[in-house]
From Swiss-Prot:
This is UDP-N-acetylmuramoyl-tripeptide--D-alanyl-D-alanine ligase. Pfam families: Mur_ligase, Mur_ligase_C, Mur_ligase_M. Its main location: cytoplasm. The lineage of its organism: Bacteria, Pseudomonadati, Pseudomonadota, Alphaproteobacteria, Rickettsiales. ATP binds at G106, S107, V108, G109, K110, T111, S112. It comes from Rickettsia conorii (strain ATCC VR-613 / Malish 7).
Length: 449
C-alpha cells in the first residue's frame, strides 16, 4: 500500500471521508492494474475521458478535477487541479523518504544502467527504479508518487533534449549520487555542440549538497569539460570509471567466449572475475559504473558481480528473440550515432553465417544528420552483412554509399518494407533491427510475430 485516505487528505489539503487504499499512480488508463490510483491529467487527451476505463481495470481510486458520472462514488477524489495534486504527492514522497537517491543521465545507456543497478541491489534491499524510460518531468513525478515509504534505494533516469530540463528535475529529486554514462550526438538538433550537451547533462549536479557524489564515465566525450563544471560547482567527491587504470573503476578485460563472455573488473583496487551469458561490450562498460556505485555504497561488490548474470536486455533494447528460423536482435527503441555503432559492433561479434541489418533513421541530429548517417557505412561493412535494409529519409545517405556487393534495399518508411519484403525471416539468419523510435521499426516484429 502506497497511499491511503489519511495521507492523501493531508498531502492534498482536502477531506477524504471514504476508506481508500491504493498502490502505484497511473495517468494512462491502459497501464492501470488492480489497486492502482488513476489521476486524470490533461494532455493531448483529457484523462477524465478514461476514468471509467481505469475503474473497469481495477483502479482503487481516481483523482479528478471535474465531475465524471461513475457508479462507485467512493472511489472519487475531487481536486482543483490534477497536475498540482500530482506535484504535491511527488514532493511529499521525496521530502519524507529516507531512501538514498541515485540519478542517471547520459546520451545513451540510461535505462540499461538503471536496470542493471536495480538488479544488483534488489537482492538485499528494497529498491525502487523509475519505470521504463519515462524520464521527463511528468515521468519523474509519477514515479516519485508511486514510491513505497520503506524504499531504501531509489534509482531514477533523467532525460532531456533541451537546456534547463534536468536542472528542473533535480530541484525536486535531489539525488545523493548522480552518474553520467556518456556524452554523444543524441539530440544534437537542439544544441550547437557536444560541449553544450555536456553542460545540459551536468545540470544533474546543480542541486548537490556537500556530501553528494558524482560518478563519471572517463572515456566519454567532453570528460574534461565535465570535470571543469564540477570544479566550478565546488563538487569534490568525484569517482570515474572506464578503460583506463587511472580511473576508480576499470573494465580490464572483455573476452568473447561464444555463448558467454569473461569479464575482469578492477573496482577501487579490488579485482573481480566473472563469466556471464554473452552480452555486447558496451553493456559491460556501463556495468563498470554500476559496480563502482555498489562499492561507493559500501556493499559487497563480489556478491553484486555474481548477479550480473541475472541482467537481461529489456524489450527493444538489445533483446534477442527467435522469429521463424532467425535470431533477431531487437534494438529499435532508440538510436544515436554512438548506440548505432555499438549495435553494429555487437552484430559483428555474434557468430553467424548470414547477417542482415535493418537500419532506421537516427533522429534529432539536425544539420549533422547526413554526415553522421554516412559514418555508419564503415560499421555496416565491418559487421559483414550480406543484406541491408534501410528505412527512413536519412538512411538514403547510407544507401548511396554502400557497395554493390551488398544486397541492399531502401524504403521510405517501415510500412513500405513490410509490404515489399515478404520473406524477411525465412532464411537462417542473424538480423539486427536498429533505429530511432520515431521510425517505428518495432512494427516489423509485431507484424511477423
Amino acid at each position: 500500500m502506497i497511499w491511503n485516505s489519511k495521507t492523501l487528505s493531508a498531502v492534498l489539503g482536502i477531506t477524504i471521508s471514504n476508506s481508500i487504499s491504493c498502490n502505484e499512480v497511473q495517468f494512462n488508463s491502459k497501464d492501470v492494474k488492480k489497486g492502482n490510483l488513476f489521476i486524470a491529467l490533461q494532455g493531448n487527451r483529457d484523462g477524465h475521458d478514461y476514468v471509467l476505463d481505469a475503474i473497469d481495470k481495477g483502479a482503487a481510486a481516481v483523482i479528478i478535477s471535474k465531475r465524471v458520472e461513475i457508479n462507485d462514488k467512493d472511489k472519487i477524489i475531487l481536486v482543483d487541479d490534477c497536475f498540482e495534486a500530482l506535484q504535491k504527492m511527488a514532493l511529499y514522497k521525496r521530502e519524507n523518504s529516507k531512501a538514498k537517491f541515485i540519478a542517471i543521465t547520459g546520451s545513451v545507456g540510461k535505462t540499461s544502467t538503471k536496470e542493471a543497478l536495480k538488479v544488483l541491489l534488489q537482492h538485499d534491499f528494497l529498491v525502487f527504479a523509475s519505470r521504463g524510460n519515462f524520464n521527463n518531468k511528468l515521468g519523474m513525478l509519477i514515479n516519485l508518487a508511486s514510491m513505497a515509504d520503506d524504499t531504501e534505494y531509489a534509482i531514477f533516469e533523467l532525460g532531456m533534449n533541451h537546456k534547463g530540463e534536468i536542472r528542473e528535475l533535480v530541484q525536486i529529486l535531489k539525488p545523493n549520487i548522480a552518474m553520467i554514462t556518456n556524452i554523444s550526438e543524441a539530440h544534437l538538433e537542439f544544441f550547437n555542440s557536444l560541449e553544450e550537451i555536456a553542460e545540459a547533462k551536468c545540470e544533474i549536479f546543480a542541486n548537490f549538497s556537500k556530501n553528494d557524489i558524482a560518478v563519471i564515465n572517463a572515456d566519454t566525450n567532453c570528460y574534461n569539460k565535465i570535470l571543469s563544471i564540477l570544479k566550478n560547482l565546488s563538487i569534490t567527491d568525484i569517482h570515474s570509471f572506464g578503460r583506463s587504470a587511472k580511473t576508480s573503476a576499470e573494465l580490464i578485460l572483455y573476452e568473447n567466449l561464444g555463448e558467454q563472455v569473461y569479464l575482469k573488473y578492477k573496482i577501487n583496487k579490488k579485482v573481480l572475475d566473472v563469466t556471464i551469458p554473452f552480452i555486447p561490450r558496451h553493456f559491460t562498460e556501463n556495468y563498470t559504473g554500476v559496480l563502482l556505485i555498489i562499492d561507493i555504497l559500501g556493499k559487497d561488490i563480489e556478491i553484486a558481480a555474481n548477479h550480473l548474470a541475472n541482467i537481461s536486455p529489456t524489450k527493444g533494447r538489445g533483446e534477442i528473440i527467435n522469429i521463424q528460423n532467425c535470431r533477431v536482435i531487437c534494438d529499435y527503441y532508440n538510436a544515436s550515432p554512438q548506440s548505432m555503432k555499438a549495435a553494429l559492433e555487437y552484430l559483428k561479434q555474434v557468430p553467424a553465417e548470414n547477417k542482415t541489418a535493418i537500419i532506421g533513421d537516427m533522429l534529432e541530429l539536425g544539420e549533422n544528420s547526413k554526415r553522421l548517417h554516412e559514418k555508419l557505412v564503415q560499421y555496416i561493412l565491418d559487421a559483414a552483412c550480406s543484406k541491408v535494409y534501410l528505412v527512413g529519409v536519412n538512411t538514403k545517405y547510407i544507401n548511396d554509399l554502400l557497395p554493390a556487393k551488398i544486397a541492399k534495399k531502401y524504403f521510405k518508411n517501415v510500412d513500405e518494407l513490410i509490404t515489399h519484403i515478404t520473406d524477411l525471416f525465412e532464411g537462417n539468419e542473424l538480423i539486427l533491427i536498429k533505429g530511432s523510435r520515431g521510425v517505428k521499426l518495432d512494427k516489423i516484429v509485431d507484424y511477423y510475430k
